[in-house]
């Protein structure tokens, strides 16, 4: 079944895997999803990911990260810019939760966090926020 909003599908799969305490979750592959996974890995929200190519279709296997008490490291993940209402921000991007959380932004320089966008002086489409 075709998905109209691939980013919303991606974050929903991560959210559901965390709530179900799954070790891994499989997500259909796209270059944007791979870039987002790399960013989440660098920021410590996921344990790791691998791109798996099969005869039918490629997918990304994301390893979920949990605390010692079994609490998911992704406490909240919410889509901001949607297909029906795109949200763009200039180079003066505000901090999410006073800097405790992150906005993930698609810019001309790739997919980066709000902090990196402020440092580089670029704006873009706010894909989602994560805490």
Curated annotation (Swiss-Prot):
Q: Which UniProt keywords apply?
A: Ribonucleoprotein, Ribosomal protein, RNA-binding, rRNA-binding
GO CC, any one term: ribonucleoprotein complex
Q: Which Pfam families match?
A: Ribosomal_S8
Task: List where the protein spans the membrane.
Answer: none
InterPro entries annotated for this entry? Ribosomal_uS8 (IPR000630), Ribosomal_uS8_CS (IPR047863), Ribosomal_uS8_sf (IPR035987)
As one GO molecular function, the record gives: structural constituent of ribosome
* Organism domain of life: Bacteria
A GO biological process of this protein is:
translation
Instruction: Kindly give the SUPFAM superfamilies that the UniProt entry links to this protein.
Output: Ribosomal protein S8 (SSF56047)
Q: Which family does it belong to?
A: Belongs to the universal ribosomal protein uS8 family.
- Please describe what this protein does: One of the primary rRNA binding proteins, it binds directly to 16S rRNA central domain where it helps coordinate assembly of the platform of the 30S subunit.
Quaternary state and partners of this protein? Part of the 30S ribosomal subunit. Contacts proteins S5 and S12.
Entries under PANTHER family matching the protein? 40S RIBOSOMAL PROTEIN S15A
Q: What is this protein called?
A: Small ribosomal subunit protein uS8
Per the UniProt record, the lineage of the source organism begins with:
Bacteria, Pseudomonadati, Chlorobiota, Chlorobiia, Chlorobiales
Q: What gene is this protein translated from?
A: rpsH
């Amino acid at each position: 079944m075709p998905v109209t909003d691939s980013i919303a599908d991606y974050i929903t799969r991560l959210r559901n895997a965390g709530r179900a305490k799954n070790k891994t979750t499989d997500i259909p592959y796209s270059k944007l999803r791979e870039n987002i996974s790399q960013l989440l890995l660098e920021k410590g929200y996921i344990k790791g990911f691998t791109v798996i190519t099969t005869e039918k279709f490629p997918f990304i296997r994301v390893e979920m990260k949990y605390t010692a008490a079994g609490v998911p490291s992704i406490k909240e993940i919410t889509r901001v810019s949607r297909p029906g209402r795109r949200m763009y921000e200039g180079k003066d991007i505000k901090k999410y939760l006073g800097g405790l959380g992150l906005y993930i932004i698609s810019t001309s320089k790739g997919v980066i966090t709000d902090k990196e966008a402020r440092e580089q002086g670029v704006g873009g489409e706010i894909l989602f926020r994560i805490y």
